């Protein structure tokens, strides 16, 4: 089955029945998912100038003074023009009209309920050493360990590295293992198929993933296709539409998967999603994925010590992925405004729109990230900041894993899949052009949240306030600019490339970028304000240069 993405996009652009198209797709695959200015006395403003002056040989006294500023920072007082009560901001969306949340009285086509789903998470320094005991408890004696070559190389030089600790635990518990390390950074259909094939040749009773999102997503896919091989080995069977067929995963996977993250962004240890880049022919490709609650790891071992070997640029990219998870989750369309209404409970999508449970996790994740990302990037040995960043990533995963993400991620898939001549620093052993996921996500964020702010100004103002904005004299019309400015400040602080032009894109590429975004229904349908072709074109244009 060959699908050319430009044809899909053109059809969507010309169609006058986009809403019906989305509804048909949703019913066909209900489990599709993903994917204000600082004041002069602002702590982050002071940090900005301090951070830019630091060199690789950082002065310890400078660091301590900088960290002290963060630890002593206090929330900015609530605004006078817009009085924000967090619980009211959350509850008013869902419970302002109780008829919208009632099966008997809701006669429309929107949903009336949400479902909170989470897997088991164990957090703490050293929990990686427990993986062998957990596998024994699950009656696993022969497992396949997924990782990447960079992490595997550390085994010989660092006995406290994540893979070294995992293998030590397996050997101590007498568990046989086979290592698969050919995971591709930003996986493709080709790399997924290779992992599926290798796993299928062994008689494994358990799966372990040690790495970032690419590793964990590869392990999920290999486990799925070996648990329920599709008819005629049709790889597109479980892939989200309109790229794939979007068939429902039949049931729980046949081998338990334990995920051990080594980055602080994707939160793949908490979600039932795996993302890949699919080649479509004619030199075109598209980011898409597989989504099902059955894909969630049975256990996530979240060990902050596994971030000690994380390169700073990878940490920054991971942090921005985490940031957008929190922002997009909290601003996604509310669950009771999402349509179509499911025909049965098992057709309710795992990415179901913002809801009271996802809001709690997303807001807390954002608070933790804003207080600690600078400290962590400047000093990975800061135990507190490192632990907070690791835990915040899982919090964000618990949030967006139940609500979803929207425009930033939807746009990022065409940005990363259409990469030109760009290789980021800090991604060792990279053999292909690559735009890191977190980088591709954050570059559109300033424009996106200006666009979505009118859908719910209070929610956007609350996010801006958490990020450090002074909203004391803010009005609802200021919400988008205030939040956008805070995001830009953080991007400058951490030296993110200045827009899509810095990655090699030109204005002549925007049409292709838009057409690559339009089919990403699994995330764009969760936008609180739906975007047309022209809207997306402007969002990409505004993201070309940011500073």
From Swiss-Prot:
Top enzyme class: oxidoreductase
Task of the protein: Catalyzes the cofactor-independent reversible oxidation of gamma-hydroxybutyrate (GHB) to succinic semialdehyde (SSA) coupled to reduction of 2-ketoglutarate (2-KG) to D-2-hydroxyglutarate (D-2-HG). L-3-hydroxybutyrate (L-3-OHB) is also a substrate for HOT when using 2-KG as hydrogen acceptor, resulting in the formation of D-2-HG.
Family indicated by similarity: Belongs to the iron-containing alcohol dehydrogenase family. Hydroxyacid-oxoacid transhydrogenase subfamily.
Enzyme Commission identifier(s): 1.1.99.24
Top-level lineage group: Eukaryota
One GO cellular component term noted in the UniProt record for this chain: mitochondrion
Native species: Dictyostelium discoideum
Catalytic activities: (S)-3-hydroxybutanoate + 2-oxoglutarate = (R)-2-hydroxyglutarate + acetoacetate; 4-hydroxybutanoate + 2-oxoglutarate = (R)-2-hydroxyglutarate + succinate semialdehyde
Protein name: Probable hydroxyacid-oxoacid transhydrogenase, mitochondrial
């Amino acid at each position: 089955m060959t699908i050319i993405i430009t044809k899909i996009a053109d059809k969507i652009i010309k169609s006058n029945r986009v809403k019906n198209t989305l509804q048909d797709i949703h019913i066909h695959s209900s489990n599709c998912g993903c994917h204000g200015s600082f004041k002069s006395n602002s702590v982050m403003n002071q940090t900005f100038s301090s951070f830019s002056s630091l060199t690789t040989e950082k002065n310890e006294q400078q660091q301590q003074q900088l960290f002290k500023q963060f630890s002593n920072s206090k929330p900015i007082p609530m605004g006078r023009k817009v009085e924000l009560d967090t619980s009211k901001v959350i509850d008013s969306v869902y419970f302002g009209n109780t008829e919208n949340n009632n099966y008997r009285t809701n006669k429309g086509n929107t949903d009336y309920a949400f479902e909170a789903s989470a897997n088991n998470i164990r957090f703490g320094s050293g929990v990686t050493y427990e993986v062998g005991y957990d596998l024994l408890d699950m009656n696993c004696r022969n497992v396949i360990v997924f990782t990447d070559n960079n992490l595997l190389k550390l085994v010989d030089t660092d006995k406290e590295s994540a893979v070294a600790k995992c293998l030590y635990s397996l050997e101590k518990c007498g568990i046989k293992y086979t290592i698969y390390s050919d995971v591709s950074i930003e996986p493709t259909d080709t790399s997924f198929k290779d992992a599926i094939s290798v796993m299928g040749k062994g008689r494994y009773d358990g799966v372990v993933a040690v790495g970032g999102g690419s590793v964990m997503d590869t392990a999920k896919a290999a486990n799925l296709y070996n648990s329920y091989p599709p008819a005629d080995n049709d790889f597109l069977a479980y892939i989200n539409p309109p790229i794939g067929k979007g068939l429902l995963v039949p049931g729980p996977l046949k081998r338990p998967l334990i995920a051990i993250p080594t980055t602080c962004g994707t939160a793949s240890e908490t979600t039932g999603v795996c993302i890949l880049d699919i080649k479509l022919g004619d030199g075109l490709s598209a980011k898409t994925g597989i989504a099902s609650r059955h894909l969630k790891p049975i256990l996530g071992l979240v060990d902050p010590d596994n971030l000690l070997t994380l390169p700073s640029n990878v940490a920054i990219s991971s942090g921005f992925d985490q940031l957008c998870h929190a922002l997009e989750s909290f601003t996604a369309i509310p669950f009771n405004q999402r349509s179509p209404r499911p025909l049965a409970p098992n057709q309710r999508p795992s990415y179901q729109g913002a809801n009271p449970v996802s809001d709690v996790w997303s807001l807390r994740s954002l608070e933790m990230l804003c207080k600690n990302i600078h400290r962590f990037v400047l000093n990975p040995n800061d135990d507190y900041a490192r632990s907070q960043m690791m835990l915040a990533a899982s919090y964000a995963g618990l949030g967006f894993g139940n609500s979803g993400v929207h425009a930033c991620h939807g746009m990022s898939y065409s940005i990363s899949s259409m990469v030109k001549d760009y290789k980021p620093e800090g991604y060792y052993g990279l053999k292909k052009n690559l735009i890191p996921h977190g980088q591709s996500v954050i570059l559109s964020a300033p424009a996106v949240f200006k666009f979505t702010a009118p859908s719910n100004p209070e929610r956007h103002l609350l996010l801006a306030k958490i990020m450090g904005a002074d909203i004391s004299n803010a009005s609802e019309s200021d919400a988008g600019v205030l939040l956008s400015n805070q995001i830009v400040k953080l991007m400058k602080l951490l030296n993110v490339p200045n827009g899509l032009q810095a990655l090699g894109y030109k204005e002549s590429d925007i049409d292709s970028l838009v057409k690559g975004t339009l089919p990403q229904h699994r995330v764009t349908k969760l936008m609180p304000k739906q975007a047309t072709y022209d809207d997306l074109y402007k969002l990409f244009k505004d993201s070309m240069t940011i500073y």
